[in-house]
Curated annotation (Swiss-Prot):
Modified sites of kind Phosphoserine: S4, S9, S10, S11, S13, S15, S17, S19, S55, S56, S57, S58, S118
Protein name: Activated RNA polymerase II transcriptional coactivator p15
Listed PANTHER family: RNA POLYMERASE II TRANSCRIPTIONAL COACTIVATOR (PTHR13215)
Protein modification: Activity is controlled by protein kinases that target the regulatory region. Phosphorylation inactivates both ds DNA-binding and cofactor function, but does not affect binding to ssDNA.
Compartmental location: Nucleus
Glycyl lysine isopeptide (Lys-Gly) (interchain with G-Cter in SUMO1) crosslink site(s): K68
Cross-link (Glycyl lysine isopeptide (Lys-Gly) (interchain with G-Cter in SUMO2)): K68
Species per Swiss-Prot/TrEMBL record: Rattus norvegicus (Rat)
Ranges of biased composition (kind: Low complexity): 7-16, 45-57
Family according to the record: Belongs to the transcriptional coactivator PC4 family.
Molecular function terms, GO-annotated: DNA helicase activity; DNA-binding transcription factor binding; double-stranded DNA binding; identical protein binding; RNA polymerase II cis-regulatory region sequence-specific DNA binding; single-stranded DNA binding; transcription coactivator activity
Length: 127
């Protein structure tokens, strides 16, 4: 028989057990597992900071804005060149983060898209 989280109010004798069940449900909802904090060694923090600055500047060089918060970027991922067309959003610290909406094209797909641009333009003009 499936367990239900609904509380059925009955006579006053059952109200004590109902309140106990309610308290247990509230406790379960409040418990949120915390993510473990990663500790960095003193030498690592400076290296990580330097690499993040370097990657962000190179990322900015390869980003081309095509809309309000939409960019085309060229990047290297596991030795393969990818062209990303993606929406970005601003986090609470004012840093741009990539959004869910987007696509990554490998070089073959990018070449096929470039070859079909004139056909796509013609289709847009017809509409």
């Amino acid at each position: 028989m499936p367990k239900s989280k609904e509380l059925v109010s009955s006579s006053s004798s059952g109200s004590d057990s109902d309140s106990e069940v309610e308290k247990k449900l509230k406790r379960k909802k409040q418990v949120v597992p915390e993510k473990p904090v990663k500790k960095q060694k003193p030498g690592e923090s400076s290296r990580a900071l330097a690499s993040s600055k370097q990657s962000s500047s190179s990322r900015d060089d390869n980003m081309f804005q095509i809309g309000k918060m939409r960019y085309v970027s060229v990047r290297d991922f596991k030795g393969k060149i990818l062209i990303d067309i993606r929406e970005y959003w601003m986090d609470s610290e004012g840093e741009m983060k990539p959004g869910r909406k987007g696509i990554s094209l490998n070089m073959e797909q990018w070449s096929q898209l470039k070859e079909q641009i004139s056909d796509i333009d013609d289709a847009v003009r017809k509409l």
